């Protein structure tokens, strides 16, 4: 991929897996690390699972650095971007740019939840670029990726992220557009962002004197 296309970065989705892996390699590596067998279930109060979390985070970090090193040897300005690294502090230390995959709300989630996620990441990554990935479709239990939400729903979700320091990054699945209503909505979002970007980036205070009362 790097030799042929020279991309600016490779974003790896769902790379951390789901739950505990019981393959022969994970069994062997975890046993050598901890002296334990892999835990039977995810229980954060279990001592063995706590060791598993420590080992798993360390292993993911090793893979992150390995793949990033290979990519940068092919193109120095390119990066490997892991989606959803479990430790936000490590993410802040190692990343030049961070993405949050919080595409839309579901159920009774409040609109300001997107801004809350941005604030949490700012606490660990500082002022590094933060891309807020958003989707145009429904994000309920049964996700239909060809669906399109209302303009008001999409815009308020993205606006909350932008207001708290995110840069908008939209995602759309499938190369065929069955419902084109989202195109104009996303165009509006980016036009508004472009017109106001200088205020969103240049946020260092100009004041030299502060008053405390």
Language-model-derived ranges and their functions:
Residues 1-17, 70, 192:
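An active-site-proximal structural segment forming one wall of the substrate-binding cleft
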